[in-house]
Amino acid sequence: MNTKIIDGTYIAERIKKDITQKVYADMNMGKRAPGLAMLLIGNNPISKIYIAHKKKVCKQVGFKSFLYNLPITATKTELLQLINILNNDKNIDGILIQLPLPDKLNDIKILEHIIPDKDVDGFHPYNVGRLCQRSPMLRPCTSRGIMTLLKWYNINTFVLNAVIIGASNIVGRPMLMELLLAGCTVSITHRFTQNLQVYVKNADLLIVAVGKANFLPSSWIKPGAIVIDVGINRLKNGNIVGDVHFPSAYKRAAYITPVPGGVGPMTVISLIQNTLQAYHAHVCCDSKKKIHFKKF
């Protein structure tokens, strides 16, 4: 089978160049640079790597990034107070909280405290609700990135039988809504699903997001399927692998994303796209183009 590797790194770079041109065109017209605030609580080394990468991309596209690194001892009240300040800062277009939060702060109300028009992660109930109502505004980044990959490779999703493995709020559930909008018949599986193999073997489009290295046996994959691997797992030898065993899955799939270099870069560039979208809503003089959000 002539399998095609879906190159998320290449596509993200192409989108990055387009965003950079738009940002500098706006700035040449006298507008300010887009601003992204990033909140990091504690010193989780993996989280610090992710934040550093996001800051790097912001600089590359002409955004201003603002890092707020709170100590692990920070209280919920302190975090909410900071979010309030950023909500009202006219130079900030997007606010993201680097997950996971410490257990004592792992409260959905913290994410909900970000006003919807600055929720560039797309996690606020308002933005999730807009997606459910077929009128998306700021969309969850990973699912948006996956849809961009499919579109870039001219993959027609209409009437495909899609299966999502993993029902998280970050990936699985928003992915379900995106695929419904794209005309798929969608099944979403989770830890209580019985006979997972039956679902997988019937999938034309397979999205795997469970966070377990080489979780999915390649023998389950339908020949000619489209395989999107969201997992990022570090093995004991230091290698990074996905939830799907790539070498064997490659022999069965028509399209497949590698790990790394597939979905990961698209998640970051989708965050940048959301921030640019929010920025244009905040600075655009044409009120017809503004995003109008309900105040929470």
Curated annotation (Swiss-Prot):
GO BP field: L-histidine biosynthetic process; methionine biosynthetic process; purine nucleotide biosynthetic process; tetrahydrofolate interconversion
Keywords annotated in UniProt: Amino-acid biosynthesis, Histidine biosynthesis, Hydrolase, Methionine biosynthesis, Multifunctional enzyme, NADP, One-carbon metabolism, Oxidoreductase, Purine biosynthesis
Its EC number(s): 1.5.1.5, 3.5.4.9
Function in brief: Catalyzes the oxidation of 5,10-methylenetetrahydrofolate to 5,10-methenyltetrahydrofolate and then the hydrolysis of 5,10-methenyltetrahydrofolate to 10-formyltetrahydrofolate.
NCBIfam families, sorted: PRK10792.1
Family, as annotated: Belongs to the tetrahydrofolate dehydrogenase/cyclohydrolase family.
Name of the protein this chain belongs to: Bifunctional protein FolD
Organism in which the protein naturally occurs: Blochmanniella floridana
